[in-house]
Every structure is written in C-alpha cells, then in structure tokens.
Amino acid sequence: MKKRIAIVLFNLGGPNSLELVKPFLFNLFYDKAIINLPNPLRYIIAKIISIIRERKSQKIYSLIGGKSSLLQETQEQRLLLTKKLKQLIKEDFAVFINMRYSAPFVKETINQIKKYNPSEIILLPLYPQFSSTTTGSSVKNFLQNLDIPIKTLDIPIKTVCCYPLEEDFIKAHVSLIKEKLYDKNFCILFSAHGLPEKIIKAGDPYSFQIKETVKAIVKELNIKDLDYKITYQSRVGPIEWLKPNTEDEIELAGKLKKDVIIVPISFVSEHVETLVELDIEYKLIADKYEIQYTRIPTLGTNKIFINSLTNILLRFINKVDTNLVTSSSSTRICPNEFTKCLCKLKN
C-alpha cells in the first residue's frame, strides 16, 4: 500500500503586519519554554512585555517593510522542497508549515493535515541546532494539539531532532562563505541567536550543537590560521546570556582595524534578527571604525541547503521505525549531560 506522508516544517514565525506585532510578542513570551513560570504570572508578564515592547518592535519592523519576511521565505523553501522530493519519491506527500508564534498556527496546520489524511507524519524543524526553546517547544506544542481522531489512528510520527552536522547543510554554509572571503586581515564571527545561560545549564544542547556546526564548517573551509569566533546576538533583559556578544566582538575587531565577516549560523531564513540587527544595527559599529563589514546571507533557498533537507527527509521516509525521534544522522549527537535533547540517551 502506497504511503501518504505529511511533512511539517516548523519555524518561529513573525508578525505579518504592524498590528500583529503585539500578539506575536505575547505569544512568544507566553511560551513556557521561554518564560518558565506558572500561570497567571506568566500570562501577566507576557502581557506587560508585549505592551512595553510593541512600539519599539513596530519601528524595527517598519525598517523591513512593516512585516516579517519569514513566512514568505518558508513558503519558498516548501515549494522547492516539494519540487525536489517529487523527482525522487513515488509516495504521495504534502508539505505543511507550522509557525510557533504566528499564523499558520498549530491548530490550522493540524486541520490541514487531517484533511490530507496521511498514513505517517514527519516533523522537520527549520532549526538546524536543537534547543528546548525552539524545536523542543514546537514539537511539544504540535503533539499536545493533536486531537483524538489522529491519536486513536496511531499514525507514526517521525521527528527530526536536529541536523547540525548534516553534510550538505555544512557545504551550503561553506559555499556562501567562500563567495565573500577577503584576501587578508579579516575575522569571521559565527553569530547565533543567544539564549539565557540558565537554559543551557538546565541541560539544553544548543550551544554544544552550535560549536559542532562551526567546527565542521571551519574544517571544510580548510584555511590555515583562520581567525574566527562563535558569538551570540539578540539578548533581552538583565539576566546572563550566552557570550561573547556579537556587537562586542565587532567593536573589538574595529579597534584592531580588522575587517569582519558575519555568518548567521543558527538562522536558515532572513528575518528581523538578520535584516535589522545584523545588517543595520551591527553594521553601524563597523562603520564607526571604518572597517569592512560583510554579512553572509542565510541559507534560505540555497540549492545545497534544499538538498540537505531533501536528503534528511528521504532517510526518514525510508525508516520503518514508528514514532522515531533522532538527529538527521539517526544517532544521538549530544553527550548525556544534555538532558533536554529529544533523542534517547547514548548507551
């Protein structure tokens, strides 16, 4: 019997208009994976933050056309992925999108999946490196919202936990970096979205996987004495976040009169953190010191990146295991100390 496969792409989401900035912020900060407090306290805090940050965030989104570009780019990725898969498999399949904090929300996506009536579901996060705050939150939210009809049918659900070392994912980064390399006197800053230190200390493998990705890229670049560093951006509030900060390292490079190449290492789509934070705010720091500032594009619809997603899906489609949760390499990448990882512990 022919399989009928529902593939779900997860991403963060973003406001599709300035009016939707406040509800987007509320949804973000109301997520227990982001603010781990009981209700009604979490609800109150999310309400306060969304009110306080609304106007500032609206000004930021005004700089990029008054809305997030994330959904449009994810739709383009979906179309390319669908086209590629149709060339390679005979099974019936459909690719769905589920944004965590904006439309299409989880219930809308699940209703579409129900109409499609799949024989199995594959969950593919557009977060290469796992975090409990991104992939973990999206997968949990999806599974919690599956209603009784789907649950009682016992449809296999296969989950791609992460793919920080996927071969074509690494090659896609390397190809984009090589296009922009200078001859001399530059440093590469691999800029990832920051997380509070307490989340990492609680067993989240995010920073470990970021390091693994960067290590693989640097090895593939094969540049002798390459000057590079992993940095973190987008910190919010007074608590301790992962360090070093991207803006501080740009400042340091400026003082040393060293040109900067920025690689957005944890983002696979252009959105406010790349288009405003990296392209506008951080570039001003480089301009102050009159150093060259080059920002590598996100992987987006890069052909090699789409190939990497395709290869991951092919592997999972061919697996007979039901309710599988593993990395793209079918093994647990993280040491056992990272207890928030979705994969089973290593033997």
From Swiss-Prot:
Its EC number is 4.98.1.1. Keywords: Cytoplasm, Heme biosynthesis, Iron, Lyase, Metal-binding, Porphyrin biosynthesis. Fe cation binds at H193, E273. GO terms for biological process: heme biosynthetic process. The keyword Nucleotidyltransferase does not apply. Catalyzes the ferrous insertion into protoporphyrin IX. PANTHER family: FERROCHELATASE (PTHR11108), FERROCHELATASE, MITOCHONDRIAL (PTHR11108:SF1). This is Ferrochelatase. It comes from Rickettsia canadensis (strain McKiel).
